Amino acid sequence: MGKYVVALDQGTTSSRAIIFDKEQNIVGVSQKEFTQIYPHEGWVEHNPLEIWSSQYGVLQEVLAKTNITADEISAIGITNQRETTIVWDKNTGEPVYNAIVWQCRRTAGIVDELKKDDEFAEYVKANTGLLLDAYFSGTKIKWILDNVEGAREKAEKGDLLFGTVDTWLVWKLTNGKVHVTDYTNASRTMLYNIKELRWDEKIINKLGIPTSMLPEVKNSSEVYGHTNLGGVGGVRVPISGMAGDQQCALFGQTCFEKGSAKNTYGTGCFLLMNTGEDMVLSKNGLVTTIAVGINDKIEYALEGSVFVGGAVIQWIRDELQFIHDAADSEYFAKKVEDNGGVYVVPAFVGLGAPYWDMYARGAIFGLTRGANRNHIIRAALESIAYQTNDLLTAMAEDAGCKLASLRVDGGASRNDLLMQFQADISNTQVLRPIITETTALGAAYLAGLAVGFWESKEEIATKWAVSKSYGPTFESAKREKLNKGWKNAVSRVKGWAE
């Protein structure tokens, strides 16, 4: 048994490789950003070959800079941006089109047509746990087949394969030998029946997707195949853990108990609550998804997705050029006592849960002559907490109880002003763990459990510990006034682009 597990964390803006030891210490990290492609308004793409080269590059780099040899690696786990859709030629290994990213809204028109069939929309929700939306993979595959020359003909001949990013990476790591996904990633395609645990023929046929394109669905923790680290003749290392980034974060936060929840503050924000073996269908705009599948035992989760979370700070930095570094946002936000009545609604690509409005667009409200750069920066930061609070409110109604506490992770969870405002506006205890790399840690856990590197979930759970706790300080009247202002702002951006 080797001394380490490697997590490959393929995110929306960068690829990372993180090495953990048995005590969950981070031994090494390598990261590489890659190109964001915006061909038209509302469209977002990545180059699948750049995803692969950046991910494989950081794997090689982290091993080199830590002087860890391949035979010291017990297993590789993969976590990935979900829903992002790649279609490639199985004979040449070449993608037929760029990866269509989860944020991309190009299939909104396809979704509108599908929504005209009320019975089908209800069927999708009841069987996939998802809502008909451009966010998920199904309509993205259809778009590629309908719009890339020769793609449909190739697909019908059985020459094309579909995969979310996890599937693509495993296929590349195994030199095209293994075409698989796991339960969690399958549950984000809008093609997978999460009750019966199978690809849903009714939905697949409605979208015109040949079943030969679809990967085999496996557990989130099992050996899928091996990769040669060090090239041909190198050490064969098992790839033995795989889950979507948000499910990995839930697992990495050791939210193993029914009712436990976490929020990840990344490019978007993603709130997940473990509902155990109960598949709870939301009445409040959330989606139902698979939390994890181990030994063919499925646990479900309620999920709310915010499309633009930390990305609003990138916008403040890159487009408005108010700050030089994302970390500066807290410094400038603290220069004013409050938002000065200013609200930023960052609906750049529509609104996710609980609104699900593909046609909403971003806006800044409440500007007066006294409003300055710092008010806008603060309002942008606060928008992340307001959107999360919308999810918490919906989740409490669906679950029938208020969350006692919220475990947090992701880059923006290190922002103390944001975390305190989250506790205040949500009237909830916010807990940041010592290890905030919970997404990568979850992938490492899943891989390690499959090969005996860690013995059990119980062993893992004992390692979770709080770094900082934030308690609510607002009076209820202040909280209600601020939330009312936010709701007013959101109401004005809905349907803007119709």
UniProtKB/Swiss-Prot annotation:
Q: Which residues bind ADP?
A: 12, 16, 267, 310, 411, 415
An example of a Pfam family matching this protein is: FGGY_C
* EC number(s) per entry: 2.7.1.30
| Binding sites annotated in the UniProt record for glycerol | 82-83, 135, 245-246
Matches recorded under PROSITE patterns: FGGY_KINASES_1 (PS00933), FGGY_KINASES_2 (PS00445)
Q: PANTHER family per the record?
A: GLYCEROL KINASE, SUGAR KINASE
By what name is this protein known? Glycerol kinase
List the source organism. Clostridium botulinum (strain Alaska E43 / Type E3)
- Per the record, the gene is glpK
